[in-house]
Amino acid sequence: MTFEPISRRSFVKFAGAGALATAAPGAFAQETDANPSVTKRGKFAYQEETRARRLAWWEAARFGMFIHYGLYSIIGQQEWAMESEGIPIPQYQLLAEHLKPKPDFAREWARLAKRAGQKYMVLTTKHHEGFCLWDTKLTNYNAMQQGPKRDLVREFVDAARAEGLRIGFYYSLMDWHHPDGAICKTDLEARKRFVAYTFGLLRELLTNYGKIDILWYDVDWPLTPEEWDADRMNRMVFELQPDIIVNNRNGLDGDFSTPEHKIKAAHRAWESCETMNLGWGYQRADHEFKSPRILLNDLTTCAQQGGNFLLNIGPEPDGTVPPEEVSILETMGRWLDTNGEAIYGTQGGASISFGNYDNFTRKGNTLYIHVYFWPSGTPAAQWLKFFRPPTVVAVGGLNAKVLSARVLKTGQRVEFTQDEISLRLTGLPEQAPDEPITVIACECDRPPVVNHHRIRPLWPRYGVGMPG
């Protein structure tokens, strides 16, 4: 039996009525049908024909930073506090005057992402609470007119660019603060105003900050793609940012899928988003952090299956990243400094099965074996020659012939034997050469695929399962 936790983003409850926000009913009146060549809902010629080119850098990057930061960070009880706790909007919006990140917060985030080996950053420019972190002209509920009196998105963009990182904007379509957000499903005029407001905010984000690489929609409730005018929304996005990639959370397929709190390969580009503890936004009392080994295993599993890993930080109210998160990311970064070739630019399909203590990635004809539990000291070695000498890493069902093998951390050459059933890497030390995961690179005679199921038809040749 498997259990998948309910995602907060997929479990959306009814939002309460909103306080006034300065909407702009005509904000999108000038938008035209930029590309009428729609082939079916959400798919039009430009997006389809350019997808592979636009995705190329992202698929090579494999690892990104997600940042949840907003008014909820002040409360310190995760990002859904406003709705989960039923905080009245007139009270909640008072938090805006108290959001005052330190001057260098964005540079700290970007430098941390760089040290962690992450290649792109995605910031919550507006979460469900409706507060805009940029200098928008469409509502006074923003960071330029309240609280910090600064354009935090501008600071984020400048910091990311200074570190050579790609830039992503998260944008929540759902809005608990806007007065039309709660009634747009049933009130046609409210819907027109709210959709125009949404288009206007997106237009600002994609016009005022130079080249943007990713648009990360979230929660299209309560409207359908038709009610959002999502086809036209995406066409506007590509008109403003021709090289951008968009996800699948405005009701359309977009360019990539976004499994949350799980690793689930799709038959297309995909990215798994995950937290280090139990929440996305800052939670003061949550110290249940995953280990670097678990998170690196998640990263390698994503790469093994051809996907990306978007790992979240939840900064404190002043923008400081919690020390536990800094430590985890720096550990991951040190590992990637040595083992990055086994992650960046790898292709999916290295394995259609999982090892007892290892994962697999591949690049060309190279198989990377990620050993997260070092298999030394098994007592079975005293009875089974298979496990001698002391440490053996064994891979069953490899389709390719191995030509050479080496430990990435040390460059040490690894001895091996191979037959139809398994590859045995021998002469390895008692202690793992690297922490928290040791990677062994095997040069093969063809693109390698590990498939343990290939072994079953071969067992009878070894006298297994045959009548005695």
Placement of each model-derived feature along the sequence:
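Mature catalytic domains of secreted/periplasmic carbohydrate-active enzymes
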Residues: G16, E31-G468
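Short, cationic motifs built from Arg/Lys/His that form the positively charged side of catalytic pockets
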Residues: R8-R9, Q241
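N-terminal export signals
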Residues: T2-E4, S10-A29
